[in-house]
């Protein structure tokens, strides 16, 4: 894959050692010009994705680790890096809930134009994922009573865990690297010794205090997590200089009703779709109000179970936001346009991590 300039906003050992970029460069006065928030601490896959996005810019960008996915959104950074979906475990519900809940104010069903001027998806990348099972120095396989990690890593390694640790208790943690670090200071001896699933990069960072018992614990070797990069319109966003234009650009929308998805099927190919409970108060319906029943089924299901739909569609360059698009008006009235993955990180930049 060649670089070009864009103007758009099981247990097998591995010998390759990931290289993590520094936490940003400084300008001439030593201060970074902008910041990029990701799920920390150092050693997470989020940091690797952020470092890859960072390498596409020739301006100083500071990488800012955040303790949780929701904390990424709360920062006032120029860029925000989120894990979106995984080939084994599917969509990252924390990201979907975070993005959807922040797009919907909880008020009327249609937001004003000002409310729509929020952060936008501008790029994506697919990061190869390979987990390690790590323990504190001296801990043996037979000592392990529980395993801790992010829910995605636990889900991706479920077959491995059932085979090697069928009775181990599973504990979720905000991040994979955080789970590894927590082993070092874990004083909860009542539950016995534990382990963590993390990246090889995290295992390397803490190799003086942690041992790797297994590598490549994920269910399949062809395991990828897709990350998206969001920009903040209140900041002066730099233009990437070493990215490539996406061969299949996609646009992202949030729709409040399943019926609003039909025009997307008619106008373009839906690449991806996730539904999540809407963070809005439902309209109360009386159990005694038989007028709202039809053949024993509630007619206003969406009032009781409000849902938001995260939809990704293929576009032909102009996209649904084009002036000639028939769906543009409907999209503005019923949903929210939340960005376009118009460029990607090159393979060389990902392989350099």
Could you describe each region identified by the protein language model?
Residues 2-353:
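Domain-level signature for soluble enzymes in the chorismate/prephenate branch of the shikimate pathway
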């Amino acid at each position: 894959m060649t670089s070009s300039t864009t103007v758009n906003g099981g247990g097998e050992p591995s010998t390759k050692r990931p290289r993590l970029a520094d936490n940003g460069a400084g300008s001439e006065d030593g201060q970074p010009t902008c910041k990029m928030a990701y799920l920390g601490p150092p050693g997470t896959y989020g940091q690797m994705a952020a470092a890859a996005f960072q390498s596409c810019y020739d301006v100083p960008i500071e990488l800012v680790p955040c303790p949780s996915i929701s904390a990424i959104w709360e920062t006032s950074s120029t860029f925000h890096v989120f894990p979106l979906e995984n080939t084994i475990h599917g969509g990252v519900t924390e990201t979907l809930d975070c993005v959807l809940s922040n797009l919907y104010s909880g008020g009327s069903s249609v937001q004003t134009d000002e409310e729509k001027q929020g952060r936008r998806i501008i790029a994506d990348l697919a990061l190869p994922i390979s987990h390690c099972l790590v323990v504190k120095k001296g801990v043996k396989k037979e000592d392990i009573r529980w395993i801790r990690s992010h829910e995605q890593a636990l889900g991706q390694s479920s077959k491995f865990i059932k085979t090697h640790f069928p009775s181990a208790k599973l504990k979720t943690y905000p991040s994979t690297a955080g789970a590894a670090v927590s082993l070092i200071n874990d004083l909860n001896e009542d539950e016995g010794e534990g382990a963590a699933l993390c990246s090889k990069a995290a295992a390397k960072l803490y190799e003086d205090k942690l041992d790797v018992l297994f590598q490549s614990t994920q269910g399949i070797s062809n395991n990828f997590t897709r990350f998206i990069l969001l920009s903040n319109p209140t900041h002066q966003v730099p233009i990437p200089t070493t990215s490539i234009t996406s061969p299949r650009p996609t646009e992202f929308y949030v729709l409040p009703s399943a019926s609003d998805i039909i025009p997307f099927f008619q106008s373009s190919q839906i690449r991806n779709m996730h539904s999540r409970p809407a963070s809005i108060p439902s309209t109360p319906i009386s159990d005694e109000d038989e007028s709202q029943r039809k053949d024993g089924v509630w007619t206003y299901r969406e009032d009781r179970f409000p849902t938001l739909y995260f939809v990704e569609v293929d576009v032909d360059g102009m996209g649904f936001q084009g002036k000639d698009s028939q769906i543009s008006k409907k999209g503005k009235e019923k949903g929210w346009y939340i960005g376009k993955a118009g460029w990607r990180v090159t393979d060389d930049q990902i392989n350099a991590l």
